[in-house]
């Protein structure tokens, strides 16, 4: 197979952490061609999606003394070519958020890939319809008490009723802009005004879950089925458990309650073409559904001795065989 990965500039990626690199390595190890491009290298020509593509050869990371070690250099890029994305068997959309205009325009370009010829993971229309904070709201039995609003007075009422809450911007990633907000906070007005841009943008406010102190679980789903998980723990005084904010990771198991959550959302994910997804769970409650560029494979493989990226590529192989 020929697989294309739409990524951030490859020199910016950390091969010891980045899930996109893990997927590319797995594809190469399994005998497939790996090509890379970027969101700003996409075009539409004669109503078809094209891209500046470069074939890449990778030196896979090695697990030494419990940590991933990368060669230097860890990749080699070949000459650029301008080609139709339909020359690829599958295209992985792996550009990191925020989901801004540039990101959305890239998904519109991907609409012009004929998915009868080339599988796009995740489906561009599915990505657009699945805000990573808002998507979870349809699963009312799985989520904590939540509001979404730009109205400061309504937010205040909710916070005063719940006592302790977490405020989340709707378009950020990796814990950016997430704030702990409680009744009586002297900075309440400033926090809400800044987060909502003076009442112009809605934010999500959720009941604070004390179980967050025990970790925030990331569960990786492949076509709606859980294939691995890790627990993320906050560092120091920061209440956020994200790896990007300095949090640490620990081995974990998927509980029956978490299996139930996965079952609740599986049909929706499949219907929306959201094949590779990471969900976040705290204390048995679904808090986010990550569909743009979910991460965690490197850490799960290191902790559990698994090869999750291989499972993903093998799923693509099997799916394309069935399709053809």
From Swiss-Prot:
GO terms for cellular component: cytoplasm. It comes from the Bacteria. Binds 1 Mg(2+) or Mn(2+) ion per subunit. ATP binds at residues 159-215. One of its GO terms (molecular function) is metal ion binding. It catalyses: gamma-L-glutamyl-L-cysteine + glycine + ATP = glutathione + ADP + phosphate + H(+). Residues 133-317 form the ATP-grasp domain. Transmembrane segments: none annotated. Disulfide bonds: none annotated. Mg(2+) binds at residues 288, 290. Signal peptide: none annotated. Keywords: ATP-binding, Glutathione biosynthesis, Ligase, Magnesium, Manganese, Metal-binding, Nucleotide-binding. PROSITE patterns: ATP_GRASP (PS50975). Pathway: Sulfur metabolism; glutathione biosynthesis; glutathione from L-cysteine and L-glutamate: step 2/2. It is an enzyme of class 6 (ligase). Its EC number is 6.3.2.3. Its cofactor is Mg(2+); Mn(2+). NCBIfam families: glut_syn (TIGR01380), PRK05246.1 (NF003573). Belongs to the prokaryotic GSH synthase family. This is Glutathione synthetase. It comes from Nostoc sp. (strain PCC 7120 / SAG 25.82 / UTEX 2576). The lineage of its organism: Bacteria, Bacillati, Cyanobacteriota, Cyanophyceae, Nostocales.
